[in-house]
Amino acid sequence: MDRHKKGVPLPSPGHRERKKARTREQLTEAAVRLFAERGFEQTKVDEITAAADVVPRTFFRYFASKDDALFGWYDLPRDATVAALRARPRGEGMVTALIAALEESVRASDAQRVIRLTGRVIAKSPELQGRLDAVRTIHCRDIANALAHRLPRSAAVVAQMVTAAVTTAYASTVDVWVASGASGPMSDYTAPVLKLASKIFASVNAQYVLR
């Protein structure tokens, strides 16, 4: 039946993309939870899809492997950070914008819960730790590019430098928070580090503002 001819509106591209994003998020959350409960090696793909209430072939539309499902979650805060940078107001200092975007990307309590679970799974495997380092390098580049896009072309190298310094300090602090087993919010650890970064790069922040 032609739904359009019968007067039934077809789903908009935005609706389809949101549905795909929800499915991907459901799979990553189910994967991380099961990895934490049962162990990474012990968890099977069909167990992940059952927990996410999708069929196994759906999993492979989004991920090539269990590793991709585990690290796929890290794309969510990266994407949120990039989106937040695009939305920051013109005239704002580049460091202020970067820090605000990082904080906004993990503000939800669910995000922090998944970060904690994911961190614990990865900490048990040197191989997964190596993969995390590679993922973080890629994400740092993506965030730096998003920041540079809001600055004059001559500031591209500065954007790379500041992003590398701030995100590395931020990620290291997140790792400390996960390892500590602290029950308090992640911001108890990250806020002082980001405040220090803001002071260190105060002159850069004043010199380079968003366009």
Question: How does the language model describe each region?
Answer:
Residues 54-63:
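Short hydrophobic/aromatic patch on the recognition helix
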Residues 1-38, 42-54, 80:
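Basic, helix-initiating cap at the start of DNA-binding domains
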Residues 1-10, 145, 149, 179-211:
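C-terminal peripheral helix-coil segments that are non-catalytic and often amphipathic
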Residues 159-167, 171, 191:
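Short, well-structured alpha-helical segments
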Residues 41-42, 67-68, 76:
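Residue-level preference for short helical/loop micro-motifs built around acidic side chains
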Residues 111, 137-162, 180:
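Hydrophobic alpha-helical bundle segments that form small-molecule/ligand-binding pockets
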Residues 27, 65-70, 80-81:
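Short amphipathic alpha-helical segment with a characteristic S/N-K-E followed by hydrophobic residues
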Residues 79-118, 124:
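Hydrophobic alpha-helical connector segments
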